């Protein structure tokens, strides 16, 4: 009987060990960043161009404005940690860059900038003190703010997508 139970446990456990680890928290910051970056880009690419100008109400950011807000915030928050803002980044781009290809290009560029900058920091760098607006923070805290901000607006964009009839690509696989 014990032998049968052991064989059954081994047979059942084999598929668990054969699976790739899920992307995200099990891979730390870099895994989470890859995950939210992929979702943001996949959702932007799945959204028809005519939905980029959609907004849920007057005075609320449009779809393109939310994506550009994420991109510009990524560059700004990253600049607090040391890297320079892109020279071609101009004030007001959140409202002036509205075409799907341009928005996605800026989004990808900002996501890659965060990924590359984070890959180059050392544990000691993460402890370094920085100043943002009127308060002190650490580089590690800034990276946390960047990923939290991206996820916050991912939720907003999922709501926008569903309100305009777009299903997030990852939800279609379930």
Across the structure, where does each feature detected by a protein language model lie?
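Well-ordered alpha-helical scaffold segments within catalytic/enzyme domains
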Residues: 39-44, 78, 113-118
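Acidic/histidine-rich alpha-helical segments that form the ligand environment
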Residues: 95-130, 137-149
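Sec-dependent N-terminal signal peptides
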Residues: 4-13
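Sec/Tat signal peptide C-region and signal peptidase I cleavage site
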Residues: 14-20
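Short, contiguous alpha-helical
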Residues: 30-34, 38-41, 49-92, 131-174
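Short, low-complexity N-terminal intrinsically disordered segments enriched in polar/charged residues
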Residues: 20-30
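Residues within well-ordered alpha-helical secondary structure of globular protein domains
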Residues: 10, 46, 69-72, 109, ...
């Amino acid at each position: 009987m014990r032998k049968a139970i052991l064989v059954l446990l081994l047979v059942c456990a084999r598929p668990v060990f054969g699976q790739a680890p899920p992307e995200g928290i099990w891979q730390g910051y870099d895994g989470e960043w890859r995950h939210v970056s992929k979702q943001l880009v996949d959702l932007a690419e799945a959204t028809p161009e005519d939905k980029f100008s959609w907004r849920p109400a007057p005075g609320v950011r449009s779809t393109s404005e939310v994506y550009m807000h994420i991109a510009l915030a990524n560059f700004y928050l990253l600049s607090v940690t040391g890297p320079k803002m892109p020279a071609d980044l101009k004030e007001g781009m959140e409202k002036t860059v509205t075409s799907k290809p341009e928005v996605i290009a800026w989004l990808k560029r900002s996501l890659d900038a965060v990924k590359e900058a984070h890959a180059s920091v050392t544990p000691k760098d993460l402890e370094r003190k920085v100043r943002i607006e009127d308060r002190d923070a650490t580089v590690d805290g800034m990276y946390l703010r960047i990923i939290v901000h991206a996820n916050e607006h991912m939720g907003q964009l999922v709501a926008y997508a569903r309100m305009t009839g777009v299903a997030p690509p990852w939800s279609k696989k379930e």
